[in-house]
Swiss-Prot record:
The keyword Cytoplasm applies. Coiled coil: none annotated. The gene is lpsZ. It holds the Pfam family Capsule_synth. It comes from Rhizobium meliloti. To E.coli capsule polysaccharide export protein KpsC. This is Lipopolysaccharide-processing protein LpsZ. InterPro entries: Capsule_polysaccharide_synth (IPR007833).
Amino acid sequence: MKNVGIKKAALQMSRYVLASKQVQRALKLLGLPASRANEVSGIPKPADTSLSFPGYEAFALHGEAWQAAGEQKPIILMFGVHPWKRDVLARYFSDFRVAYVRTNTSWTKVQTSFCQFTPQAFVFWGMTEIRAAKNYAIKSSIPLWRVEDGFLRSVGLGAQHVLPLSLAVDTTGIYFDPSRPSTLETLISEIGVTENATLIERARRCMSMISAFGLSKYNVGQDVPLKRLPPSDRRRVLVVGQVEDDASIVMGCAARYTNNDIVRITQKENPEAEVIYRPHPDVLGGHRKEFSNPRDVANICTILSGDYDLGSLLDSVDHVYTITSLLGFEALIRRKKVTVFGAPFYSGWGLTDDRQPTPRRTRKPSLDELFAAAYILYPRYCVGSLGSSAEIEHAIMSLALEKNGVPRELAEGVSSALPAEAINVDCVSQTLEGLKSIPS
């Protein structure tokens, strides 16, 4: 077993060194500064991730903050985080020493460790929580935070262990639970109180890049336009299928709708339109439970079962119906009409056709303001040599490059070498062309 570990570490180090050299070479040929290109987050720099200290046996300790230089940093406890993403998540919390509660560790064992330290916060992944831990935190006035993947995550799925470029950290609630306030909801409510022309300009620049390069949360699928469908002069209305027992629906929708319910409502409300139904890929692939069979509505809609690029799909329709899917907001970015039956973070602000009341959401922000709150102010980004000091522009550029065939390590290295304010559609396009012209 020891030899296997040594070989794995050696392989990781060789990949890291190769990626770093590739980034340095590309930056030099592109005429970009290369001083920070010795760090690559797509392949994390090899580190001792098996740190252990007396009294901390209940925890997996990850991150450079556990080294001597960070020994005075406060400690946060993280619950429900899979081992494969612990290293990269620690980079998002560089101001803390991150202690991950090991799987199947009893709360009693965790609590006995508190004689060694007082946690700065308890951090839960999504809605995963240990009741005893939550009660202890409330009783002891320890802040409760929740984390989830950000809205511009990666090229590839988390289920495939693709590491995230962004993380939503919520110190109040979580964005997909409308039953209570969240940090995101507060940001949206307050963003228009003080005019910030620079922030709005950034929002517009970022939305233009997202649209130009067809970016979405996961950026999976081939660039397949809808020209393969039968020609039609009718309006096209897209129904976005979701995993029907997903937390965003269970918590975000007061009524209980199936995907087929939404298809039938869409057809009834748009009898003259061509209704296009995209079932969720995880349901089609048998990875998540199917509650409604798409074949039952095949007579009233066109069902997409292919590997369609979501950006191309949204560009090809006029109107989107969904329960709570983020694809609804991605449609708003592309100036499409959106109808929602639940209460996702972007509903209730006057920008969508809402079928569920959201009484706390009384402001009427512009789309630019809503985007700025949700994509610029709310998430944390972690890209290349910048680590958690990266901005949304770095993530957008990295995703655009990788989606167009640039290896992730190179995409992150090049993107993180540029100042955020210099990144726009032309910059990304020119960099992409430059990278394609570099001999391999």
